[in-house]
């Protein structure tokens, strides 16, 4: 006994089950029956706590698979097992699914059943073995061959044996049948049949002995044939299913037990032989098709039938066996796609879609739709690339490649979207169409037509109509079988649904590929044949490429990659555009929008026309601008970048950034980076110019330029960034610049030639300067050729002069002179003015304020640095954008002088900053046209990318930046505040940051005119090597990039401040440079911002918005930073004020960088953020601990802010304290210190603004905050963004402050003094959320449509101020985000990151929604 017990205990489930099945050799049992026997006979000790049934079932499942399995799963039945060695012939036969046997059985059984009302009894006895076998099979009983008919296994009861799924389907069928039968009974009297008794008997019998089950397989087989045909396939073609049903009498629509039992003849007599699969009266409407059609019922169907049905399933759901026959895959009929297809079919059935009348109508509609318009016929090619001279083989290869890539990239995006696309196509397509602009749309349409026709040709006639309807939508095809089925089903695709589907997929793939090519090539898209053929695309690319000479070689591959990678995104886009084509009415508007939104790819695509299309593009850009202006956010975004339509292009995304998009961009960036590096090496320094990433060339080009520029500036890193931006997304750099995620794209595209040139010029100038100065090393220049090439591409010819100039300037100064690299910005005339004047602090480079012409390139030699002459470019800047610049020019000159001096002492960057600080007045020069360049600066790009850019490289540029600052600020202020601004802001990246600073400043102006602070930190960030911008570029030049650039700048500035303060030597800042630099940085930022602001306030606003969206503290920090210069101004005391400011600056920048970092991290462009964090921390390592703590303590945003503040404070403590004294330090240490610093900076900026009202007004904070008032306002703003904003606006109104104020949100009581500001800062810290609001405020500025106007008339800053004030009020609420701690997701429109609460179900951020 003991042994036996032990044996029982040790027995496994497999052994126990085998024992049971050996005891009942010919009785297949379900797991439940086996368990019953085990329990009854005590074959295994079942412990409590386990689920014996589940264990046994799992074991049976496992051991019935594969060669070694000891059990055999009886086919066609749910979970019925027998021992493999015992598998009887009958079973095997059954498993063969030979329909005859099962049909015959069911028939014989049913005939027997029907023979008498006691059919169930008769069946049992009479049928003897067969019917019993069937019954048993269905009930899982063994064949009757076994003597014990009643119950071989004690546990088995006929009823029980049925598996649950079978029961389920039976139940469903039973119900449906009952309903139908009742209906029929009412309708007709069936005299011949004792229906009621029969029914009852049958039902009972079924219940009792699952006799009906056996039949069920048969009838189910039938129905599932017809039905599954009808339901499963129905999705494909109801008519087909109907025919099937009719053709298979057995398909009886009665897969119910009843029909099982009823005689075939009887069925026919009672008219139950056919299941209605057409009308809404069908019983199938109330049947669970999933219960009807499962692998068991399916296996009962005749083989031919199964094969035919399998063709309707997606490839993944069918497997081809060794014998070449298809088999169902395990989950084919049990997945969500099939379920939704079945559901969809049922719904369509209930809606009467399959009635002959409806089918006829649908067919007619399809026929109508099929007529190809002449113009489409003209573009038709029987295979992809035919018109481009590809041979069919090449075409196949190409499409195979693309489709593969496509497949990967596209799958996620395409699968669902596609289905929906059909419906949405008209809407979303319009966007993408917009991108391509009307030309592209037409082309695309033709392409689509071609694809469609191709598909149709391939498809069978029946499928054709369906396909036509489906295909245009291009929706169902790829997504999933069920969907496809559904889609096609309504259509009369009976015969070849699958082929049609696969063809469709193929076509779609081709289509996608072609789209990809188009998109990838960007220019090619518009290219001659809108070629679907890669060659054409390449050719287009070539067209573009020439511009980008160095990158070209790489570019082509990138194009291909991009094609592949971005196919997914593009696919959607192109489909959309195709749809848009269909809806011409929408096309124009959408096209504009699209252009704005998808500038990167589309813009480049547009470039395909090369020189010709640019003009048309420009108008569209203009339209978008006007369109954008009205919208606060878009306008704001556009405003800054208005001048640089390129920026619009920035988002190459059409509204939805897809993984493919991102990947493609990354690939492109990589390739471009390589190209840029080579080019940079070749062109050694002039490449930076192309930096017109923001406004630069057409969409893509700008981005590329930007990336290239940064690459040049930072050499390898920068180059990479550039490439990232440029290549990554044709408009990535632009994207970066563009405030408007999607809004600007069209503008960019079209304005590019004109406005973009300006913006690009600005950017380029600055970037070149920065690049140069940043590179200060020849190494930096390396990427410049690439940049210039990119720029050219970007501007597509529009900025070739820029390029040339850039290159020239680049060559001019390797050491610290950014020199005239900026000059190249000629195309960007106005922007250039600003950018051109960017002087390098170390070398006061020449900044060519080539307002309108490259000629403008004033090569301010290093002399500029030495003297104010450096600002000459500024003065020269005739650019419309830079009206203020010109005034600044004098200031800039002064600033330039100051900068130059320090520049000598301090190696590039910091020295400039100190000088700036020292000579606030001279700082004016620095403010230069920095604003324009930021996006393009390679350094900036690198920073954005999160690459480590030497601080020195970046810092020198700050001077240029200062130069860039608009003189609008009072000379004194400019000197006092502006200089610091220049140093911190304009020169802000005082050394290597120069480039970055410029770029950021431009960006700031463009993106965040109200973001002096960010610029500064950004400057620091650059040194930190933080260039998330590049990454962001691809994502959303406009928002993300702007934000990132600003952040980077802020970080850099912070770093500068920190570095100068903490380690002057490290920063290479003049000794006094620390404090001075800090303050100068702030001021410079302010100036730069002002100038920039004037140039592109909208961008700034957008940027801010992004920040607020990001819920970054950096925004507020930036604001604070901006304030810093003002505060300093307020302080007035160069020593004390600047010192304090320095500390503040540092704090702010750190804060900004950290928050930026965090935010960036959040963003997909998180790179910047991450990098910033990292950067910041190292720089602010001293400050890091408190900062981080603060960070932790504050929420995400507040934490960011706190961190920045703390870090800044710490740094400040380290340096500022040194320089300024313990007050700053204490503040820095305190959470309030941060706020105070912030406020201080704001105050200084305010002072700046007040002094240089005109000048400042364009600037974010500076302009907003007249002086201390402004600063004070800012402080409260930080605390209470809205109210302060209003106040600030009022106060700033005098200066242009309000205009920026909105952005800056410097509207607090004007009386607040530095002290109060500081308190405010503390408050800010405490109100980290408040800070967030402030950031939100920045966002508010985003909508600075007026700012645009303001920009245009930099001089009339008052107006801009008002506009800004209004804007800020408007945007204030939207910009505020109260969910700072929540998870961030990416906006599908511009790629900006925000909280999912903010973005909401539309997946669009506030600014995109406003734009839409």
UniProtKB/Swiss-Prot annotation:
Q: Name where it's found.
A: Nucleus
Compositionally biased region (Gly residues): 688-705
Keyword Transcription regulation in the entry? The reply is yes
An example GO BP is: positive regulation of transcription by RNA polymerase II
Where is there biased composition of kind Polar residues? 594-608, 746-784, 905-930
Its transmembrane ranges are none
Q: Coordinates of motif Nuclear localization signal in the sequence? A: 181-185
Compositional bias (Low complexity) at which positions?
103-121, 139-166, 174-188, 228-241, 706-717, 876-890, 1257-1280
**For the DEUBAD domain, which residue ranges apply?**
280-389
Mind listing the UniProt keywords for this protein, alphabetically? Metal-binding, Nucleus, Repressor, Transcription, Transcription regulation, Zinc, Zinc-finger
What's the domain of life for this entry? Eukaryota
Bias (Basic and acidic residues) ranges: 442-459, 504-521, 1166-1178
Q: Where are the zinc fingers (PHD-type)?
A: 1374-1411
| Stored InterPro entries | ASX-like_PHD, ASX/ASX-like, ASX_DEUBAD_dom, Asxl_HARE-HTH, DEUBAD_dom
**This protein's domain notes:** Contains one Leu-Xaa-Xaa-Leu-Leu (LXXLL) motif, which may be required for an association with nuclear receptors.
Quote the function comment for this protein. Answer: Putative Polycomb group (PcG) protein. PcG proteins act by forming multiprotein complexes, which are required to maintain the transcriptionally repressive state of homeotic genes throughout development. PcG proteins are not required to initiate repression, but to maintain it during later stages of development. They probably act via methylation of histones, rendering chromatin heritably changed in its expressibility. heritably changed in its expressibility. Involved in transcriptional regulation mediated by ligand-bound nuclear hormone receptors.
Q: What is this protein called?
A: Putative Polycomb group protein ASXL2
User: What is the scientific name of the source organism?
Assistant: Gallus gallus (Chicken)
């Amino acid at each position: 006994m003991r042994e036996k017990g032990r044996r029982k205990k040790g027995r496994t489930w497999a052994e126990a089950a085998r024992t049971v099945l050996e005891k009942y050799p010919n009785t297949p049992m379900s797991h439940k029956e086996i368990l019953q026997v085990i329990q009854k006979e005590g074959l295994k000790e079942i412990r409590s706590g386990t689920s014996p049934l589940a264990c046994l079932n799992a074991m049976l499942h496992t051991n019935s698979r594969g060669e070694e399995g000891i059990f055999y799963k009886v086919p066609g039945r749910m979970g019925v097992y027998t021992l493999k060695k015992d598998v009887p012939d009958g079973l095997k036969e059954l498993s063969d699914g030979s329909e005859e046997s099962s049909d015959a059985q069911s028939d014989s059984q049913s005939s027997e059943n029907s023979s008498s009302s006691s059919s169930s009894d008769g069946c049992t006895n009479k049928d003897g073995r067969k019917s019993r076998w069937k019954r048993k099979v269905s009930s899982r009983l063994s064949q009757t061959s076994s003597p014990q008919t009643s119950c071989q296994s004690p546990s088995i009861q006929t009823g029980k044996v049925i598996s649950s799924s079978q029961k389920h389907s039976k139940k469903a069928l039973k119900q449906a049948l009952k309903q139908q039968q009742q209906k029929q009974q009412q309708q007709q009297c069936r005299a011949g049949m004792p229906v009621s008794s029969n029914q009852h008997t049958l039902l009972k019998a079924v219940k009792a002995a699952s006799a009906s089950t056996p039949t069920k397989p048969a009838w189910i087989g039938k129905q599932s044939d017809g039905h599954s045909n009808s339901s499963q396939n129905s999705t494909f073609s109801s008519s087909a299913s109907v025919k099937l049903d009719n053709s298979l009498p057995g398909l009886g629509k009665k897969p119910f037990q009843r029909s099982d039992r009823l005689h075939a003849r009887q069925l026919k007599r009672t008219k139950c032989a056919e299941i209605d699969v057409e009308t809404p009266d069908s019983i199938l409407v109330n049947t669970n098709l999933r219960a009807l059609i499962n692998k068991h019922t399916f296996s009962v169907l005749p083989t031919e039938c199964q094969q035919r049905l399998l063709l309707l399933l997606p490839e993944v759901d069918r497997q081809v066996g060794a014998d070449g026959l298809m088999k169902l895959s395990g989950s084919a009929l049990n997945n969500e796609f099939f379920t939704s297809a079945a559901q969809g079919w049922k719904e369509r059935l209930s809606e009467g879609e399959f009635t002959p009348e409806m089918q006829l109508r649908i067919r007619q509609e399809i026929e109508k739709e099929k007529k190809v318009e002449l113009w489409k016929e003209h573009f038709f090619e029987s295979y992809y690339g035919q018109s481009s001279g590809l041979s069919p083989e090449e075409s196949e290869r190409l499409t195979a490649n693309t489709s593969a890539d496509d497949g990967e990239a596209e799958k996620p995006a395409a699968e669902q979207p596609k289905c929906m696309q059909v419906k949405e196509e008209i809407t979303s397509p319009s966007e993408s169409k917009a991108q391509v602009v009307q030309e592209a749309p037409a082309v695309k349409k033709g392409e689509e037509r071609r694809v469609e026709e191709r598909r149709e040709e391939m498809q069978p006639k029946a499928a054709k109509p369906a396909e036509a309807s489906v295909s245009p939508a291009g929706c169902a095809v790829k997504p999933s079988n069920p969907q496809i089925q559904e889609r096609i089903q309504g259509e009369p695709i009976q015969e070849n649904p699958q082929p049609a589907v696969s063809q469709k997929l193929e076509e779609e793939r081709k289509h996608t590929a072609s789209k990809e090519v188009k998109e990838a090539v960007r220019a090619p898209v518009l290219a001659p044949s809108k070629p679907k053929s890669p060659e054409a695309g390449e050719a287009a690319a070539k067209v573009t490429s020439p511009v980008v000479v160095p990158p070209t070689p790489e570019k082509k591959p990138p194009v291909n990659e991009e094609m592949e990678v971005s196919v997914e995104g593009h696919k959607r886009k192109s489909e959309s555009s195709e749809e848009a084509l269909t809806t011409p009415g929408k096309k124009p508007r959408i096209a504009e929008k699209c252009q704005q939104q998808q500038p990167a790819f589309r813009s480049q695509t547009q470039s395909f026309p090369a020189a010709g299309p640019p003009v048309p593009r420009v108008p569209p850009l203009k339209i978008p601008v006007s369109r954008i202006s009205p919208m606060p956010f878009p306008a704001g975004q556009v405003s800054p970048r208005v001048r640089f339509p390129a920026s619009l292009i920035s988002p190459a995304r059409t509204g939805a950034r897809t993984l493919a998009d991102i990947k493609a961009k990354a690939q492109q960036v990589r390739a471009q980076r390589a190209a840029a590096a080579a080019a940079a090496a070749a062109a050694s320094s002039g490449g930076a110019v192309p930096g017109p990433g923001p406004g630069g060339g057409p969409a893509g080009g700008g981005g590329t330029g930007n990336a290239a520029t940064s690459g040049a500036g930072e050499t390898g890193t920068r180059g990479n960034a550039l490439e990232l931006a440029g290549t990554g997304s044709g408009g990535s750099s632009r994207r970066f610049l563009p405030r408007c995620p999607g809004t600007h794209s069209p503008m960019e595209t079209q304005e590019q030639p004109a406005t973009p040139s300006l913006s690009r010029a600005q950017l380029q100038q600055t970037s070149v300067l920065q690049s140069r100065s940043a590179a200060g090393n020849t190494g930096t220049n390396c990427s410049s050729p690439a940049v210039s090439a990119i720029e050219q591409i970007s501007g597509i010819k529009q900025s070739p002069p820029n390029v040339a100039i850039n290159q020239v300037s680049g060559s001019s100064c390797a050491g610290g002179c950014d020199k005239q690299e900026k000059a190249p910005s000629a195309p960007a005339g106005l922007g250039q003015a600003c950018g051109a004047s960017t002087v390098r602090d170390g070398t006061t480079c020449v900044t060519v304020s080539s307002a309108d012409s490259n000629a403008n390139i004033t090569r301010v030699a290093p002399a500029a640095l030495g003297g104010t002459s450096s600002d000459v470019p500024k003065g020269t800047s005739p650019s419309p954008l830079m009206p203020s610049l010109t005034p600044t020019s004098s200031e800039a000159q002064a600033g330039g002088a100051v900068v130059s001096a320090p520049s000598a002492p301090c190696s590039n960057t910091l020295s400039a900053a100190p000088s700036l600080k020292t000579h606030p007045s001279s700082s004016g020069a620095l403010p230069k046209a920095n604003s324009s360049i930021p996006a393009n600066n390679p350094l900036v790009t690198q920073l954005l990318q999160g690459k480590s850019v030497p601080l020195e490289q970046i810092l020198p540029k700050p001077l240029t930046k200062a130069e860039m600052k608009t003189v609008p600020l009072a000379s004194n202020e400019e000197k006092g505040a502006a200089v610091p601004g220049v140093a911190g802001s304009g020169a802000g990246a005082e050394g290597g940051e120069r480039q970055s600073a410029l770029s950021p400043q431009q960006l700031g102006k463009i993106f965040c005119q109200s973001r002096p602070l960010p610029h500064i930190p950004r400057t620091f960030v650059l040194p930190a090597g933080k260039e998330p911008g590049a990454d962001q570029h691809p994502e959303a030049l406009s928002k993300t990039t702007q934000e990132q650039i600003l952040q980077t700048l802020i970080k850099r500035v912070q770093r500068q401040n920190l570095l100068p303060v903490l380690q002057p030597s490290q920063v290479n800042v003049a000794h006094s440079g620390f404090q001075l630099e800090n303050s100068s940085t702030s001021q410079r930022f302010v100036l730069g911002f002002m100038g920039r602001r004037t140039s592109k306030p909208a961008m700034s606003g957008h940027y801010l918005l992004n920040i607020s969206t990001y819920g970054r503290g950096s925004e507020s920090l930036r604001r604070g930073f901006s304030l810093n210069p003002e505060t300093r101004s307020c302080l007035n005391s160069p020593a004390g004020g600047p010192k304090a400011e320095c500390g503040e600056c540092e704090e702010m920048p750190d804060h900004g960088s950290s928050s930026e970092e965090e935010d960036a991290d959040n963003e997909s462009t998180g790179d910047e953020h991450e990098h910033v964090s990292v950067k910041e921390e190292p720089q602010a390592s001293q400050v890091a601990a408190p900062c981080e703590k603060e960070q932790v303590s504050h929420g995400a945003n507040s934490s960011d802010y706190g961190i920045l503040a703390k870090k800044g404070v710490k740094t400040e403590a380290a340096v500022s304290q040194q320089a300024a004294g313990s007050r700053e330090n204490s503040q820095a240490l305190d959470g309030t210190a941060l706020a105070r610093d912030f406020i201080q900076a704001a105050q200084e900026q305010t002072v700046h603004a007040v002094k240089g009202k005109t000048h400042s007004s364009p600037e974010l904070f500076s302009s907003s905050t007249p002086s201390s008032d402004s600063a004070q306002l800012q402080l409260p703003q930080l605390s209470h963004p809205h109210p302060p904003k209003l106040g600030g606006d009022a106060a700033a109104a005098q200066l242009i402050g309000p205009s920026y104020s909105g952005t800056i949100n410097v509207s607090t009581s004007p009386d607040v003094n530095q002290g109060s500001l500081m308190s405010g800062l503390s408050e800010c810290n405490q109100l980290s959320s408040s800070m967030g609001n402030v950031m939100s405020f920045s966002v508010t500025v985003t909508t600075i449509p007026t700012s645009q106007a303001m920009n245009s008339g930099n001089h009339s800053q008052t107006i801009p101020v008002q506009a800004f004030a209004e804007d800020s009020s408007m945007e204030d609420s939207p910009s505020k985000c109260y969910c700072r701690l929540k998870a961030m997701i990416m906006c599908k429109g511009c790629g900006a990151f925000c909280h999912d609460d903010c973005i909401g179900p539309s997946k669009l951020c506030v600014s995109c929604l406003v734009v839409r």
